[in-house]
């Protein structure tokens, strides 16, 4: 573990990146970034694990590694992550992204956005070794979200250095149950993996990587680690950086695309946040899902006021803040834009859920208020009837939608049906075969979009504003 501690001074804080120490060889073949969402219950050690992976240090058992990556003051003080944040490991030109998400149930909508809107390839479920997995706990909810979105995941068991043997045995039984329910083969990595010829990965591990990537054999690796003692930390880091992204595997023909129509799509960049930078202007951050985007390219941004406005790309930065000329498929970054459409536009008009594309007609055709879908209701306390409203999470979209059912039709838990859903606020860009989630209170479910009605052929619902109740104050009688 001395190599871990030595590299602290070499990493620095520049761009929040940790490098493997190998030179970046630009002549190497282009390899897209692998993205992992880091999930798990509160106090499981997610941020500490990400801090150890990113900074190449060991934790002191009192939140030191976590404090190095905390974004806000209250996160440093309380240790509770309330926002999603991305952290990067650069290894010989390949970028591995760790997306640290919230573990508290209060911030579940932020976690759902991270899973659906940040286009991750794999998941890391962090479980504290000295805790129990409750059937209705947050960890099980996160696992169900990953399974619903067809995202393979690795289970990382932290705090293994302070775990009693009986608790670990009980935890393994829970993992066996989860694997059998998901029809996955479980693989345990308990003992400390030794380095051999400069690598912690052996032939048996390569078989694991291949089965994890091609998804023909469904596996659920469970790795025991300790952020404090360094147990299996180097092994996990090398394993994560060795697994290739889904985009790279599709390009190589090793796996089939989830959506067969994706080859016919134009360039699409999904926006997950926007900024107004003094001296620069509007900056949009997001992921290029299809095609590529270049500096100087003239594109369309929207939907903005039910249309798409003309923009020009002035500058591009990749996910590690490097100034680049191009963002390729599956790469995340930010673009500085110039608005070419005349009009009055404010920063508030550019939000998550919008897209940047080079095909105006394609964008208008797929911008809808209403869409047809097939849904499955996982949980609901009573019955769902016509007009039921819930929040739809689809890629970077997060907007209330209203169910359109027949008057005599009702849905209950474990129901599956086809229906129309209508957005209540504004039209959104949606594509067929997209997976979406809906959640509201104790209601949970998912669906697959089958098609939409272009908003120019549809009419928005009229939202009735509720009158504010004014409490009448009785007049005081003035005595004579």
From Swiss-Prot:
Any Pfam family = GTP_EFTU
Question: Positions of the region G5?
Answer: 226-228
Outline the segment boundaries, as ranges, of region: G2: 79-83
**Domain tr-type G, chain residue ranges per copy:** 31-248
Q: InterPro entries given for it?
A: EF-Tu_GTPase, P-loop_NTPase, T_Tr_GTP-bd_dom, Transl_B-barrel_sf, Transl_elong_EF1A/Init_IF2_C
Q: Which residues bind GTP?
A: 40-47, 100-104, 158-161
MF-aspect GO terms? GTP binding; GTPase activity
Q: Where is this region: G3?
A: 100-103
Question: Which key words tag this protein in UniProt?
Answer: GTP-binding, Nucleotide-binding
Task: Specify where the region named G4 lies, as residue ranges.
Answer: 158-161
Record's signal peptide: none
Q: Where is this region: G1?
A: 40-47
Taxonomically, which superkingdom? Viruses
What family does the database annotate? Answer: Belongs to the TRAFAC class translation factor GTPase superfamily. Classic translation factor GTPase family. GTPBP1 subfamily.
Q: Record's PANTHER family?
A: ELONGATION FACTOR TU-RELATED, GTP-BINDING PROTEIN 1
* Name of this protein: Putative GTP-binding protein R624
